[in-house]
Amino acid sequence: MKKLLCVFFCVMLAALSAVVFTGGKDTQKNYIKYVEFNVTKDALQNAVDLDIQTHDDDRHTDCITMLAYLGAKYGGDFTKYKYSDMIDFADKIKNGETVENLTKDMKYFNYYSQAYGAALSGIVGDYEKETSKGTEKDYGLCWFSPIAKSFPYSCYDDFGAVRTYGYTRPHLGHDLMAAVGTPVVAVESGTVEIMGWNRYGGWRIGIRSADKKRYWYYAHLRQNRPFAENLKEGDKVCAGDVIGYVGRTGYSDTENTNGITESHLHLGLELVFDESQKESNNEIWIDVGAITSVVEQNQSEVVRNNETKEFTRKYKFTVGND
């Protein structure tokens, strides 16, 4: 009996060791596995505006901290949002209180800081841009509308709606309805990770942010000439660069097929807290409706080359240390 108990104990100890350590490293990674991004357009716009307005103050409060505070206060339910709550928090910071003290009793403040930080890091910051009058440096909105300036479009907010092609699944993106050939620009600077055909998204591009937390997915691009000229996987793009053109490709196993009824850009945003999440059954895609509404005020002006019929951005734009 003693021998049996000894064997059982040894087996359990070995199993526990296998769970906790692999090559001396902790395998129980502590990273976020679920995010529901319910920040409203008004809340995001107010937070961005306050961030910019207070940037030069001694007690600057960034938009992510403000939204994380409200997320913890509301339990993530931004239908409860009141501008006065945001102003109250910003005023307390301005008057000398610390974020640590104001959030010490908020159990989930750190969670919302990480979640909203992953979703929004870099949306505002230092930038340098060319204009018709020269070059200017400032602090402000650094992300761009995915549709180039002067091209008409409308948004169709159906995140989570049912899609049935291939299999029944939720729609994990935001659709921007526009004419075929409308220039698509990078919302945020990053590296092109994927370019090519996908039976669902058609011709598509995937761009990863510099901090690796955000994977932007642009799908249903134009038939025959979907991508910006000479763009390839591994290239770095700047926010506002032309990366492709609106189309209606996809919903087909046959490459270069127009399987979508109405031309539009499918814009998706995946949050990545651990690389194991990137292509898995546990991917985190968030609703970018509020984000696209806020960044539409920052559209990239483009020019057309009449010989190649390609569009490129008119004015150079540099974010931070790009």
Q: Across the structure, where does each feature detected by a protein language model lie?
A:
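Cationic-aromatic interfacial patches
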Residues: K2-N110
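Surface-exposed, glycine-biased beta-strand/turn segments
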Residues: T98-W203, A239, V294-D322
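Active-site scaffold segments
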Residues: D175, C238-A239, G244-Y245, H264-E270
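Sec/Tat-exported extracytoplasmic proteins
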Residues: V180, G196, D241, G247-G250, ...
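Solvent-exposed coil/turn segments that connect beta secondary-structure elements
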Residues: G181, A210-K212, Q223, E270-D274
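Zn2+-dependent peptidoglycan hydrolase active-site motif and core
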Residues: V187-N230, T254-E262
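Short hydrophobic beta/alpha edge segments that flank linear recognition/processing sites
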Residues: R204-I207, V237-N256
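Acidic, glycine-rich catalytic/binding loops that coordinate metals and/or anionic ligands
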Residues: T257-D322
